[in-house]
Amino acid sequence: MRWDLDAIAADPSGGWLLFEGAAAGSADFLAPLAAQASGTLVLWECLDRVVTAEYTADHFCDLIDNIEKRLAMVFHRLLETPEEGEPALTLFLNDHPVKPWDPFLCGHPAKPWHSPSAKKMTPAGMVAVECHVLPHRDAFSEPEYEAAGGPEGWTAQQGFYVYRNGRLLVAGGWLGLGKGKAWHREESQRLARIRLDIPNTADMDWKIDI
């Protein structure tokens, strides 16, 4: 199934047209999916708002890197391999497997503290919270430190990480905490990351539309 934004724009009825099968010249890109028992292949074409006249190959490589980092963060818990069994999700970007990025550095030997999981039953379902303090910069090599900072860096990635059924919805920030003055992302708090799990039954309370 596919959409064509040019076809939608040209349709006088204003309808949202949905097409079956590959667009002309695109079938070869979809061929790898035929060898899989199940899965989803996402193909973006005609990215005229992204690939502009000034766009270079370096810009495109940077974009791919940013997409990979975002996928590794948003789906990291589904991509992680459990002690027994297979990961719930496997992602490939240009035939390259996306490796999960763990914002809490679970298992790092220099991690000073993390709390046990605190669970509370709410009218919308079970909510679980874990607090994590990450290692000091001295515990990392320079590449490790940069990777642990996340896509947006150490200061921007501090705060709450809100998950719905294992998928990350919010990556950092303090969700309006603070009496009279909201907390901001500051250098002094950059080692603090809090994991908050909510169920899909809490969508209305959290105003989630997925």
Explain the meaning of each model-derived region.
Residues 63, 67, 100-101, 110-210:
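Charged regulatory segments coupled to nucleotide-binding catalytic modules in large multidomain enzymes
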Residues 72, 76-122:
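Accessory nucleic acid-recognition modules appended to NTPase machines
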Residues 1-83, 87-93:
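GHKL-type ATPase core
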Residues 10-12, 26, 51, 105, ...:
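A broad, structure-centric signal for solvent-exposed, well-ordered loop/edge residues
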Residues 7-9, 47-50, 77, 97-99, ...:
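Short loop/turn segments at secondary-structure transitions that flank enzyme active sites
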